Every structure is written in structure tokens, then in C-alpha cells.
């Protein structure tokens, strides 16, 4: 079993008999000599959807739970449920909107490279690709000749996500966004 320092986002861990899917990890180092790093795992209980937070010292053993990854593509929305289809056998996986609210900011009909994370055959969450292409819906007018400056402006993308983009980017442009950092990477070709 891995130590707390080896746990990554997307791992499923056992917390008091409950399966918790790790969505975010925060590492803190207490002051003073000999202070061990403390890992704070944030996620949600797979069975109930309740948000959970747990802390472990770096060298503590954490019980992980096996997960399965299946390549999926977005299919359609039904109320507050988002339906994704397996790329191989066309099995449908249904996700509640609250469980994948952060991931929805990066998903449109064209998003490729997504994976459904399954725990005991049940869809728990989505794993996004490292970057996605999205269209800018609204931003300030572009400034010609601004490619040399490093100044940025806010831009609202087609999914509702707002990122900082260079001044030369205009409404309607397609841009590449890093899903982990939620940052503009470059203009899509």
C-alpha cells in the first residue's frame, strides 16, 4: 500500500470504511525542525457524494481502492445528469452534475481523451485530458500589434470558464487551455 506522499489526484482511498475519490491535494510543511509534511486530501464519498477532507502525515500508509479507467465521449444532458458513452462498447455512464461540476467547465461535444473512473463497476468521476480546445465567447476587443506585450485580459469561454488570455486574442478564437491549472496555453491551430 502506498504512503500518503505517493497518492495522486484521481486515486480512490478508504477513509473509515468509505470510498473517497481524491480531487485535490494540499501539502503543508509545519515550521520547526523535524516537521513532517502533511497531506490534506479533498474529495467526495463515492456512495453519497458528500465532500470529505482527510489529513495524513507523509509516511503514513493509505489504503487505496482499485479503479478502472474507460475511454468515453460526451453524449447528452438529461436534466442534471450528464451521459457519457464508452468509446469501445457504447455503454452509457451517468454522472450527477454536482459530482463533475469542475470537469464540466472543460467539456463540450468535441472534447476527446476523457476517461470515466469506475469503482466496482460504477462511474465515480471523469478524468480530463491535460489540455482542451475551447472557443472564446466573450472578451475585450483584440489589440493589433499586442503580440509582443505580456499583458492579459479576461476571456469567457464557451463552457463558462474564464481565463486570462493575451491581448491579441479575439472573440471567436479557439484556444488551448490547461485543465489542471485552468490557464491559457496557446491559440489552437
Swiss-Prot record:
PROSITE patterns: EFP. Gene3D superfamilies: 2.30.30.30, Nucleic acid-binding proteins. CDD domains: S1_EF-P_repeat_1, S1_EF-P_repeat_2. It comes from the Bacteria. GO terms for molecular function: translation elongation factor activity. GO terms for cellular component: cytoplasm. Transmembrane segments: none annotated. Pfam families: EFP (PF01132), EFP_N (PF08207), Elong-fact-P_C (PF09285). GO terms for biological process: peptide biosynthetic process. Belongs to the elongation factor P family. This is Elongation factor P-like protein.
